[in-house]
Structures are given as structure tokens and as C-alpha cells.
Regions:
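The feature marks the first
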Residues: 36-37, 42-141, 148
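Structured loop/turn residues at beta-strand edges in well-structured enzyme cores
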Residues: 57, 113, 157, 207, ...
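Conserved beta-strand positions that form and line the central face of beta-propeller blades
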Residues: 94, 106, 153, 253, ...
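Short, well-ordered strand-loop elements centered on a beta-strand within folded domains, enriched
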Residues: 113-117, 267, 271-276
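Amide-forming acyltransferase catalytic core, primarily the GNAT-like/NAT-type
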Residues: 146, 160, 165-273
């Protein structure tokens, strides 16, 4: 489901593109913002109104390459953060949380630090083939990865690697139950009686990969590429302006369009300014 809001936020830009006052702005409904700028109406994002897209079902995991000299430090950090080592070989480590995803972070061992891209799970083998053709890239079998599957890696217009996976088997059930939900008292309802809220110190409870962000140069180019080729649509768009008639889109929160199925507010964040 889609929640369309556009947020205006002004910034100082030192690149020479535009110069606006910092620390001012407002949040307005998308349809209000669209009256004065060249945005298409919300119906433009309905999956049925566009040509067939590569159908993404969820965000799967992140992929990075790390030098061997830094692997022990990385492992210590991720274990302290709340992940666990699912599998380790001479060339890679797979780190996971407690959810049904086999792993959420892939660390390949190489000569240098390198971003290998976020990974999206696609709906069908045909979608994987279409992604492969889009990037003219091969489909490889993940023989060593927990859960297996097949993957292809393409690159977006700014050169970021983008991975697509199909056929990976999830865990049959989470490794443990989620944390007990906090009971909150309000003015009229007092479900928590005679009990304190106490938190146990320790690592975070890592469930899944929720989202990742990219800091980019050409927002319009990247935005069109991701929304034209895949079922990614904006939940929120942020823009800056130096006068009422000149507005520049600078960031977007994108979610996966699954029709009437409710999904997370965003799984990808792209900005041409400071990355969150």
C-alpha cells in the first residue's frame, strides 16, 4: 500500500547548483507539492498502469567485500551488534539474525574493501532472467550460500551494484521468538500494573534487513531507473527550493509495490545530499 507524502526541506548547496537558506522547510501533502512542480499524479505509480516490471518481493541481504586483515574486527563488531555467524569458508562469511532469512550480511574476503550491493528477492525465475538481461549479466548459482538460490548482479546508472536473488530457501521458522512487546500505559488504558519496564543489556535483536540507502549524484536519473524497471514506488519525496517556482527533488523513500498487500514504509532511500 502506498502512503504518498512529499516533504520539503531546504539546504545550502556548495556545488553551485542552487543556493537556498538552511534550516527551513515544511511537510506538505504530495498532491499540494505536485501542483507547482512536474510530478505525475499518484495513479502513475499503480503497478497496473505501467509496462511490466521486474517484480521484487522483499529486500534480502547486503553484500560487501573485506580484506582478510579486517575480517576478525568485522566479525567482532557484527557479533556485538547482535548478528551471528551462519557459515564461514575460506572466502566468505554469512551473518544472520533470528528471523526466517538465512542471512542478512554477506562478507566476501578480498584484497580491498568494496561495496557489492544490496540484494533483492524476485518473484519468479522469469523476473531473475529479465534482471539478468537488463544488465547483460550472468545468473550464477549460490552453491555455498546458506539456503542456496541463484543470483545476478547488474549496475545502476551511477555504477552501484544491484543484486537479484531467486530460489533461496528460508529457514522453516525463526530461530527464536521475538522480544516481548512493551506494555504502554496511556491516559485511559493502564494494562501495565505494578510492573516496571526493564531492559536487559546486551546485543540488539537482529530480525532482518529492513532498508539501505544510497548517496547519489544525479537524483532524477537514479529515481527514474529504479522506479521504471522495478516495482519500487515512492512513499515520500523530499525536495529543496530557492523560490516558490523552483523545486529540486533531492531524496526519496521507496517501498515495494505489492498491490493490496501491506509492506514496509520503505526499503530503499536515495539522496543527493547527506546520507542518513
Amino acid at each position: 500500500m502506498e502512503n504518498q507524502n512529499a516533504t520539503s526541506s531546504t539546504h545550502s548547496d556548495t556545488s553551485g547548483g542552487f543556493n537556498v537558506a538552511p534550516n527551513s522547510g515544511s511537510t506538505v501533502p504530495a498532491r499540494v507539492a505536485m501542483k507547482s512542480i512536474e510530478h505525475v499524479p499518484a495513479t502513475r505509480w499503480n503497478s497496473s498502469s505501467l509496462t511490466p516490471k521486474i517484480k521484487i518481493t522483499k529486500i534480502s541481504h547486503m553484500r560487501y567485500q573485506h580484506p582478510l586483515s579486517g575480517i576478525n574486527g568485522l566479525t567482532t563488531f557484527l557479533l556485538d551488534f547482535g548478528m551471528e555467524v551462519v557459515k564461514r569458508t575460506e572466502t566468505a562469511i554469512w551473518f544472520g539474525g533470528y528471523g526466517i532469512d538465512q542471512y542478512v550480511y554477506y562478507a566476501g574476503i578480498g584484497s580491498e574493501k568494496k561495496f557489492l550491493g544490496g540484494t533483492w528477492e524476485v518473484e519468479s525465475w522469469e523476473d531473475l532472467e529479465r534482471a539478468s538481461k537488463l544488465g547483460n549479466s550472468p545468473i550464477v548459482e549460490l552453491k555455498q550460500a546458506p539456503g542456496g538460490g541463484h543470483m545476478t548482479t547488474i549496475h545502476d546508472p551511477e555504477g552501484f551494484p544491484v543484486n537479484f536473488i531467486y530460489g533461496a530457501s528460508p529457514r522453516p521458522q525463526p530461530k527464536r521468538q521475538p522480544l516481548e512487546a512493551l506494555q504502554i500505559n496511556d491516559e485511559f488504558s493502564k494494562p501495565r500494573k505494578g510492573a516496571f519496564q526493564r531492559f536487559k543489556p546486551g546485543p540488539a535483536a537482529v530480525h532482518k534487513l529492513g532498508h539501505f540507502g544510497l548517496t547519489i549524484h544525479d537524483f532524477e536519473l537514479q529515481f527514474k531507473w529504479y522506479t521504471n524497471h522495478f516495482n519500487l514506488v515512492p512513499s515520500d519525496i523530499l525536495y529543496t527550493q530557492n523560490n516558490p517556482k523552483q523545486k529540486f527533488d533531492v531524496a526519496a523513500f521507496l517501498h515495494i509495490d505489492r498491490g493490496k498487500e501491506y509492506v514496509d514504509h520503505h526499503c530503499n532511500y536515495e539522496t543527493s545530499l547527506v546520507h542518513h
